[in-house]
């Protein structure tokens, strides 16, 4: 398989609240506004397919086609409007998700007839949903918004705001996105000037995420340099063991229950020698949404423990467009992805690859001066199974799992 094809497959496979940050006393204040947007129905926005999508009134029946979109809707408090969504281990951390109608196959593909039968007012389709599926729904008279892909945390912020406009929850969306953006900026600022360790993000099957990806941006915001750059990998692709060894990463990052690379060639790297391997939540690192701040905090705390310990985020410093009934419609395409945060901590079961992981969903509140629950951190030893033929097959199956996770 060529590197180009492999890269495309990897993108499809992987792309599928503010956590651990103390909010400053100004957190209860509104974010600084720099422009206005139309938040009154009807709303017309241009989607990733170039279609002008009009939502005539606040949707009462919403379908989400991927876990990331579901996460955002829950984050905005609009979960009661959801009538259909992916109902599986990748959305089980969302309260009440099991009561919704499942609209995807085991492979994460949309079930067109089921969706049409739900008579939705609006379908939210992340970019991993094919244009063909979107057009099938539109041909049946269904209103569908297909989002642009998220290649940075900034994209997540913009998608959250747009989702709020489409659902009639823009004020909540600006608050959620401001908290997300403030946390990210706080970690970036806290690690500015510090020595940046090198990091290898091991996705399994030899794949990694480059700097021009959502995951790569998380690594950068945590104050580290991605070894994928040395292999000229910008998005998702395979990276050779030789390059990893040559770059000698200070840290190796894995997600969920993915095995820690134990190739003998890596045994002399600093990461293995110093037992510097960190594990992040598989769903939150692969679902572009507000919960991205959880793996961000996990990584920043591992890479820069002293700097990350006292990080304080101030949402009041974040600029965001304010609603205006007479605002001109933006000429650029806007989009939104998905994220969610429950108002109470809960322990849920999430399947990663072929194993089950118990993960604690963090408490995210809107109270001033409150330190949010810390994301689950797990520093591991380098004694995972090697990548033999069987392990390679498992890795490929796991990659398919990540597609459904997004």
Predicted regions and their residues:
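Alpha-helical, coiled-coil/dimerization segments enriched in small aliphatic residues
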Residues: 208-236
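Short helices/loops that flank or line small-molecule/ion binding pockets
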Residues: 110-120, 139, 238-248
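A short, structured surface patch at a secondary-structure boundary
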Residues: 42-46, 61-128, 133, 142-143, ...
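C-terminal membrane-anchoring or membrane-association module
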Residues: 391, 397-406
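Short helix-initiation/N-cap motifs at beta->coil->alpha
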Residues: 47-50, 101-113, 150, 231-241
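Juxtamembrane/start-of-transmembrane alpha-helix segments at the extracytoplasmic/lumenal side
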Residues: 378-391
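Extracytoplasmic substrate-binding proteins
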Residues: 130-203, 228-230, 281-330
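Bacterial Sec-exported substrate-binding components of ABC uptake systems
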Residues: 2-70, 170-200, 302-378
């Amino acid at each position: 398989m060529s590197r180009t094809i492999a890269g495309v497959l990897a993108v499809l496979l992987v792309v599928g609240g503010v956590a651990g940050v103390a909010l400053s006393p100004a957190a209860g204040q509104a974010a600084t506004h720099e422009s206005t947007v139309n938040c009154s129905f009807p709303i017309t926005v241009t989607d990733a397919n170039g279609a002008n999508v009009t939502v005539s009134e606040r949707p009462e029946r919403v379908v989400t086609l991927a876990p990331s979109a579901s996460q955002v809707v829950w984050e905005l408090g609009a979960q009661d409007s959801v009538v259909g969504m992916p109902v599986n281990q990748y959305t089980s951390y969302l309260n009440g998700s099991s009561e919704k109608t499942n609209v995807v196959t085991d492979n994460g593909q949309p079930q067109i007839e089921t969706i049409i039968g739900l008579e939705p007012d609006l379908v939210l389709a992340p970019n991993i949903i094919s244009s063909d599926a979107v057009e099938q729904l539109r041909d049946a008279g269904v209103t569908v918004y297909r989002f642009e892909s998220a290649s940075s945390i900034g994209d997540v912020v913009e998608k959250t705001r747009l989702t709020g406009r489409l659902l009639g929850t823009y004020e909540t969306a600006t608050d959620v996105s401001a908290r997300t953006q403030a946390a990210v900026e706080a970690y970036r600022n806290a690690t500015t000037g510090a020595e940046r360790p090198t990091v290898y993000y091991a996705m399994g099957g030899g794949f990694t995420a480059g700097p021009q990806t959502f995951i790569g941006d998380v690594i950068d915001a945590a104050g580290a340099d991605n070894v994928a750059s040395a292999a000229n990998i910008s998005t998702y692709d395979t990276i050779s063991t030789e390059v990893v060894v040559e770059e000698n990463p200070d840290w190796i990052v894995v997600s969920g229950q993915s095995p820690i690379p134990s190739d003998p060639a890596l045994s002399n790297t600093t990461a293995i020698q110093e037992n510097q391997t960190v594990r992040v939540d598989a769903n939150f690192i692969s679902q572009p949404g507000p919960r991205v701040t959880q793996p961000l905090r996990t990584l920043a705390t591992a890479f820069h423990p002293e700097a990350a310990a006292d990080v304080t985020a101030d949402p009041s410093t974040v600029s965001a467009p304010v609603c205006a009934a007479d605002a001109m419609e933006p000429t650029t395409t806007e989009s939104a992805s998905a994220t969610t945060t429950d108002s109470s901590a809960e322990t849920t079961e999430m399947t990663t690859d072929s194993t089950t992981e118990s993960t604690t969903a963090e408490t995210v509140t809107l109270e001033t001066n409150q330190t949010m629950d810390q994301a689950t951190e797990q520093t591991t030893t380098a004694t995972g199974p090697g990548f033999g033929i069987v392990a390679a097959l498992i890795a490929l199956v796991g990659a398919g799992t990540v597609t459904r996770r997004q």
